[in-house]
């Protein structure tokens, strides 16, 4: 049933019948093109972050269920890898159309399970959709290379081939975007894919599977399993799985990279961040303050590219009171409420950790100029809400600076020169993203050239590249050789075969008859 034909609650209920059990709200698996109930005895309750009411129960899939997903993917690879690249491209054409037409329903599910505002949830879907759109150019992206006449009568050419069964392990903060970073690139290159969405937000992935079926993707090309630590270990250890993509925390990312790597798998692992925004006194003040507030507090700060650290250079520190006032005016509420700027964080545990890191800053000497920890939201008193929070007079040895807070908290530092700002950022172990706000081109150029961070914005607070490029976080924020999506994404999901062939000119058959007098030479 096409999602586009369904509206409101009717759509939500219809979808639930597809991937959940209506009487007891339990999320299903997706194996061999079908939504399947798990036989597990272990379940994880998924709570609405705005109310903490249980939305659904997510299974910890059994060993047999995970094995069946791998077998399905292994079987499908035999035919899918031999499917015309034009046929694989057609699936992406259809999928991008279906996602675009059902963006609103996907966003509603994301807001319900993850908590972010509806506008932000639509952005979540859109940034994933852009990867699908880029996959539609696979006929160019997957081209090989040729050198004719590398020697007498000899040609060399190379072409890219799929790896086999691949897997993706997804985080909670982007329920649609991150799965769409993974399985579309993998399967368009001819692989099959097993996706493990975060047990906190599986709904968007399940809806995408329904759309993938409608797009005509054959059974087994993508399978979805659920679970926590055991599911991760299964993916890392199973010998059939050739490559693993991960986005999430430092601890999990390092663990997956090392464990899967020991088992001979390719791994790409996007991990933690501490993204700095450098504010020069010559910047456009109004635009800069608006961008700072949006990048720091949007999505309740639960973005790997959130601008969580502001570095004010010279007289720019005089702008801090104005920034505080902008942050104070942001509306905190449930994500589905119109006009909401900041929704809840994902869980009570996340809220507690955020509050503790803020308190650690205060104890270590930072000034709490805006405190959102005690905010109460009418009609949602049980929600996981933290309002915009700003700490000033922060130093680089404080825990609130050294650790990724992952909440609506901005820590502010001051320096005298752009050189000091560059040194500070380069000394931080993370390298996901950074930005500078200035109207001076020479300052911007110096910053771009000297900064050791993978993604740099100039008057752009969250410099996440579009999919014709790649997501190029570096240093402590990434482990692996090839980044997500773009040309590097295609390289990650393919292997190169190089052929050197020799065909002697003298061996050509059916040549023109020779009628000249034989000379015996």
From Swiss-Prot:
Primary enzyme class: oxidoreductase
Reactions catalysed, as given in the entry: 2-methyl-3-oxopropanoate + NAD(+) + CoA + H2O = propanoyl-CoA + hydrogencarbonate + NADH + H(+); 3-oxopropanoate + NAD(+) + CoA + H2O = hydrogencarbonate + acetyl-CoA + NADH + H(+)
Catalytic-site annotation from UniProt: 304 (nucleophile)
The keyword Mitochondrion is assigned to this record: yes
Subcellular location: Mitochondrion
UniProt keyword terms in alphabetical order: Mitochondrion, NAD, Oxidoreductase, Transit peptide
GO molecular function (one): methylmalonate-semialdehyde dehydrogenase (acylating, NAD) activity
InterPro entries registered for this protein in UniProt: Ald_DH/histidinol_DH (IPR016161), Ald_DH_C (IPR016163), Ald_DH_CS_CYS (IPR016160), Ald_DH_N (IPR016162), Aldehyde_DH_dom (IPR015590), MeMal-semiAld_DH (IPR010061)
Record CDD domains: ALDH_F6_MMSDH
Enzyme Commission number, as recorded: 1.2.1.27
Annotated positions binding NAD(+): 172, 196, 199-200, 249, 404
Keyword Disulfide bond tagged: no
BP GO terms, sorted: thymine catabolic process; thymine metabolic process; valine catabolic process; valine metabolic process
Any one annotated GO CC term: mitochondrion
Function of the protein: Probable malonate and methylmalonate semialdehyde dehydrogenase involved in the catabolism of valine, thymine, and compounds catabolized by way of beta-alanine, including uracil and cytidine.
Recorded family membership: Belongs to the aldehyde dehydrogenase family.
Subunit structure: Homotetramer.
Protein name: Probable methylmalonate-semialdehyde/malonate-semialdehyde dehydrogenase [acylating], mitochondrial
Species assigned in the record: Aedes aegypti
Lineage: Eukaryota, Metazoa, Ecdysozoa, Arthropoda, Hexapoda
